[in-house]
C-alpha cells in the first residue's frame, strides 16, 4: 500500500507528512517527507481547544470548541498536503490510504481504577471528502477503552524502521517530543515502551510563558544557565516516576511552578537536566543496556538535551540521521505505517507498550463520500 501519514505534535508547530509503501509489516519504499507550519489562526484555535480540554470534567458535554477545531485540523491537513503533493509531483489518486493522527488536546492515563481519556481532534470524514481517499484515524481510543494507556503507539514502527536499517537488538529508540518516550527492542518479538517523562514540552511552555519565543532554539538559554538541583529533585518527586511501566503522560501533567523563582536561562538548564534524568531513570526501570540509543523528535535539535542524554545514559547516543532516518518525519511515517496495519487488521498496541491485556487492533477508516 502507498500511504500518506500525517502528524501534528503537542508543540503546535507544523503538520508533518511522510509517504511510505508498506504492507504493515515491512517497508518497501520511503517516499517524500516534509512539513508545513501551522497558521497562527489554527494555533489559536487549538490552544483554545486544549485549554477547554484541561477544564473538561468527566460526565460533562464535550466542549463546543472541539467540533470547530476538528474541522480546522482537517482543513489545515488538506492545505498542507496540497502544497506537499504539488512540490513532489504527486496526485491524490496515487495513494491507497491516508493516516491522520489528529491533534491531541487531552490525554489522561488510567489510574486507581478510573479509565483513561484521550482526545485527538481532526475531522477524518472531511479530509476523506476533500482528498477523495480513505482516511485511517482515531488510533488510540480502542486501546484506552480496553484499559490501556493509549500511548505510545510508535513502537511497532520503531521496530520496522530499525529492521529496514539493518539494526539489531538490543536497541533503544528515544523520541524526544513534547513528551519523551522510549522503545526497548530486546530481541525477536520482544519489545517494550513507555513515556519516560517530559521531553521538550515543558521547555517550550516555559519559554512561551516568559515571552522569550516559542522554544529554546539551539539550547541558547539552557547553554548559559545553571542547573538548580533542588528543583530537579522536586520535579522528580512526581508520583509518575514511581508508577510501573508501561505508562503514559500528557505534556501538561507537570507544573512549571517550581521554576518560577529561577531566571529563564537557569530554568531552561534545569528542565534539560530533569528531562535527561527522567530518561535515565526510565532506562534503569528496564534493567537492560542497549547497544545504542537512537534519538528522534524535535528534542534532538537542542544540543543541551543531547549532551545531557549522552552524559546520563548507559549506551552511545546517536541521532536518527546517523542511521539515515528522517528524524523529523518518524511520527508521520509511523502513522502511515499504523494506517496500513489498521487497514489489514493488524495490532498496533501491545501489553508491554500500553499495558493493554492483549495485542490490540486500533484505528477506524472513513471512506470518502
UniProtKB/Swiss-Prot annotation:
Domain of life from the UniProt record: Bacteria
Residues annotated as binding ATP: 9-16
InterPro entries: Anhydro_N_Ac-Mur_kinase, ATPase_NBD
Swiss-Prot/TrEMBL keywords: ATP-binding, Carbohydrate metabolism, Kinase, Nucleotide-binding, Transferase
Signal sequence coordinates: none
GO biological process terms, semicolon-separated: 1,6-anhydro-N-acetyl-beta-muramic acid catabolic process; amino sugar metabolic process; peptidoglycan turnover
Catalysed reactions, as listed in the record: 1,6-anhydro-N-acetyl-beta-muramate + ATP + H2O = N-acetyl-D-muramate 6-phosphate + ADP + H(+)
Pathway stated in the Swiss-Prot or TrEMBL entry: Amino-sugar metabolism; 1,6-anhydro-N-acetylmuramate degradation; Cell wall biogenesis; peptidoglycan recycling
Keyword check for Cell membrane: no
Pfam family, one: AnmK
Catalytic EC class: transferase
Keyword ATP-binding in annotation: yes
GO molecular function: ATP binding; kinase activity; phosphotransferase activity, alcohol group as acceptor
EC number: 2.7.1.170
Sequence similarity: Belongs to the anhydro-N-acetylmuramic acid kinase family.
Function: Catalyzes the specific phosphorylation of 1,6-anhydro-N-acetylmuramic acid (anhMurNAc) with the simultaneous cleavage of the 1,6-anhydro ring, generating MurNAc-6-P. Is required for the utilization of anhMurNAc either imported from the medium or derived from its own cell wall murein, and thus plays a role in cell wall recycling.
The protein's name in its UniProt record: Anhydro-N-acetylmuramic acid kinase
Source species: Phenylobacterium zucineum (strain HLK1)
Source organism phylogeny: Bacteria, Pseudomonadati, Pseudomonadota, Alphaproteobacteria, Caulobacterales
Amino acid at each position: 500500500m502507498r500511504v500518506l501519514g500525517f502528524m501534528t505534535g503537542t508543540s503546535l508547530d507544523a503538520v508533518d507528512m511522510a509517504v511510505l509503501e508498506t504492507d504493515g509489516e515491512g517497508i518497501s519504499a520511503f517516499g517524500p517527507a516534509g512539513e508545513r507550519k501551522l497558521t497562527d489562526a489554527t494555533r489559536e484555535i487549538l490552544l483554545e481547544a486544549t485549554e477547554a480540554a484541561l477544564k473538561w470534567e468527566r460526565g460533562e458535554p464535550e466542549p463546543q470548541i472541539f467540533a470547530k477545531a476538528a474541522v480546522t485540523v482537517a482543513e489545515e491537513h488538506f492545505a498542507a498536503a496540497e502544497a506537499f503533493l504539488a512540490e513532489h509531483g504527486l496526485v491524490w489518486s496515487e495513494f491507497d490510504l491516508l493516516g491522520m493522527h489528529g491533534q491531541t488536546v487531552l490525554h489522561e492515563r488510567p489510574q486507581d481504577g478510573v479509565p483513561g481519556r484521550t482526545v485527538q481532534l481532526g475531522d477524518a470524514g472531511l479530509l476523506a471528502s476533500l482528498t477523495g481517499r480513505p482516511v485511517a484515524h482515531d488510533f488510540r481510543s480502542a486501546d484506552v477503552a480496553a484499559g490501556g494507556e493509549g500511548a505510545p503507539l510508535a513502537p511497532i514502527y520503531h521496530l520496522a524502521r530499525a529492521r529496514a536499517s539493518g539494526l539489531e537488538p538490543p536497541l533503544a529508540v528515544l523520541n524526544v517530543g513534547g513528551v519523551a518516550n522510549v522503545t526497548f527492542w530486546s530481541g525477536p518479538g520482544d519489545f517494550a515502551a513507555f513515556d519516560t517523562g517530559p521531553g521538550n514540552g515543558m521547555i517550550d511552555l516555559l519559554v512561551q510563558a516568559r515571552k522569550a519565543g516559542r522554544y529554546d532554539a539551539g539550547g541558547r538559554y539552557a547553554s548559559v544557565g545553571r542547573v538548580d538541583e533542588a528543583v530537579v529533585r522536586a520535579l522528580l518527586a512526581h508520583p509518575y516516576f514511581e508508577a510501573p511501566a508501561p505508562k503514559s503522560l500528557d505534556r501538561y501533567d507537570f507544573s512549571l511552578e517550581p521554576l518560577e523563582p529561577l531566571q529563564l536561562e537557569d530554568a531552561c538548564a534545569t528542565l534539560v537536566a530533569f528531562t535527561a534524568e527522567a530518561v535515565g531513570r526510565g532506562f534503569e526501570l528496564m534493567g537492560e543496556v542497549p547497544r545504542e540509543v537512537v534519538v528522534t523528535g524535535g528534542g534532538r535539535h537542542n544540543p543541551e538535551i543531547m549532551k545531557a542524554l549522552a552524559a546520563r545514559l548507559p549506551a552511545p547516543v546517536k541521532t536518527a540521521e546517523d542511521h539515515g532516518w528522517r528524524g523529523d518525519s518518524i511520527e508521520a511515517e509511523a502513522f502511515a505505517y499504523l494506517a496500513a496495519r489498521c487497514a489489514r487488521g493488524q495490532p498496533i498496541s501491545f501489553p508491554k507498550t500500553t499495558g493493554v491485556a492483549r495485542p490490540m487492533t486500533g484505528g477506524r477508516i472513513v471512506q470518502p463520500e
